[in-house]
Regions:
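Predominantly extracellular/luminal cell-surface or secreted proteins
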Residues: 1-3, 125-129, 167
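N-terminal cofactor/phosphate-binding cores enriched in small/glycine residues
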Residues: 139
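Short beta-strand elements bearing conserved aromatic residues within extracellular beta-rich modules
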Residues: 122-124, 162
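The feature marks proteins involved in alpha-glucan
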Residues: 5-111, 132-135, 143-189
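Short edge beta-strand/loop segments characteristic of extracellular beta-sandwich folds
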Residues: 1, 110-117
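Short proline/glycine-enriched turn/loop motifs at strand-loop junctions of beta-rich domains
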Residues: 115-122, 157
């Protein structure tokens, strides 16, 4: 089940509440490829499931609240679990490995790029100094193939202070807006 507004709950004995959609998963009976089995050797043996959808659909789903739910014949929850998606994100956004991240300053422009594949929205906050409020807010656009959010400002912003606002689903809290520093920064205030 998935929820685009992060308000889904799954309690045993009743149907899932607040889902905006569901996806039937397929049992994957084949052995995992050796490279994947080695990478996740710390995960105990269990059922392997497959989502029979295109990569673009999976990318969009990972930006939402996701629950793996086992239901009875009447649609009542038997068991539910949150998904652990780091391995899936690495596979879905492998192209990001070749993308420049952080800030790149040139005489006539400054590019900002942040890898945040599960974010629902990202904005750049430009600050006058390291402690004051944002003076301007610039929306970033996501490249759905890489999960990188970016924008270009048509001027040299050398020495400018900035942070990001990142809207993301957080298990147990819903949709949360975080003000974060640039993880690729070479200096922080």
């Amino acid at each position: 089940h998935h929820s685009s507004d992060s308000r889904m709950t799954a309690e045993p004995g009743i149907p899932v509440v607040g889902a905006t959609g569901a996806l039937d998963l397929e049992l994957h009976a084949d052995a995992l490829p050796p490279a994947i089995a080695a990478r996740f050797r710390h995960v105990t043996a269990g059922v392997t499931l497959r989502a029979p959808v295109a990569a673009d659909t999976l990318r969009e789903l990972h930006r939402q609240q996701l629950l793996l739910v086992q239901e009875d014949a009447d649609g009542r929850v038997l068991r539910a679990a949150r998904l652990q998606s780091p391995g899936a994100l690495d596979e879905l956004y492998a192209m990001a490995a070749d993308t420049g991240l952080g800030v790149t300053v040139a005489p006539d422009r400054t590019r900002f790029a942040l890898w945040a594949p599960t974010a629902r929205n990202v904005a750049l906050c430009l600050h006058r100094d390291g402690t004051g409020p944002a003076q301007s807010l610039e929306p970033l656009r996501q490249d759905s193939r890489t999960g990188v959010w970016s924008t270009v400002i048509d001027r040299d912003l050398s020495g400018q202070y900035y942070t990001y606002l990142v809207d993301v689903h957080v298990d147990g809290a819903g949709l949360v807006r975080n003000r974060v520093s640039d993880p690729y920064a070479i200096s922080l205030t």
